[in-house]
Amino acid sequence: LSAYDAASHKYWRQQLQQQLPEFDWTQLALPARHFNWRIRSNAMQWASQEYERLTQSHDLLLATSMVDLATLRGLIPDLAQIPSVLYFHENQFAYPAGQQRKENVEPRLVPLYSVMCAEQVAFNSAFNRSSCIEGALALSRRLPEALPTRLFEKLEASLVLPVPLVPPPELSAIHHQHENIASAGESAIGTAALEVVWNHRWEYDKGIGLLAE
């Protein structure tokens, strides 16, 4: 389940299906638009529009952190009978607010509810994992009542599973050209050329200012 199917989320789920062909996959995805509405309404949409598909016999439920997993399993009890894995591509605690963006607590709480009901939680990087834990702790101190201890136990027990990257064919020629340049550089100055890869969107939330520095 991919509730906010942005390019990186789409790539991830498609690669899972391609690299694990021994499994019979059923994929459901919602367009990456109207973020606040999408993160809060996806369970309601799927429960009403995909009820028959979601109540078929499945062995495992794999959902991105944008999925309101707690609500979905409540609306479709059959999904509560199979194990679920929650995968964090990012977390709202590490997402920069920006000058025009007001703080909204709800998009931060929805994934935490999902953590509470998932059998296994995984993050795409150690930074994503640690910043989520730190952010949840900071939020807990500000709330009228502290977040449950069980939540932090599950976050601490979570895994780090990087997204497998498969270079697209059009990059092969470019990489080969870079290797030729590197070889020429080695013969000229005795050191290999440095190759830098930027594997993020070119937007403020990805830290382009830090890269420039």
Can you describe what each PLM-predicted range is?
Residues 1, 124, 196-200:
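Short hydrophobic "strand-cap" motifs at the C-terminus of beta-strands
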Residues 1-12, 33-39, 206:
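A short, glycine/small-residue-rich beta-strand->loop->alpha-helix junction that serves as a flexible
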Residues 12-24:
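A short, Lys/Arg-enriched amphipathic alpha-helix followed by its capping loop at the start of a domain
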Residues 25-76:
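Active-site donor-binding segments of glycosyltransferases and PAPS-dependent sulfotransferases
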Residues 61, 77-97, 111-123:
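Active-site proximal beta-strand in glycosyltransferases
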Residues 94-113, 137-147:
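Nucleotide-sugar donor phosphate/pyrophosphate-binding loop at the beta->alpha transition
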Residues 118-177:
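A short, active-site helix/loop in glycosyltransferases that binds the activated sugar's phosphate group
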Residues 165, 169, 180-206, 212:
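Conserved donor-binding/catalytic core segment of Leloir-type glycosyltransferases
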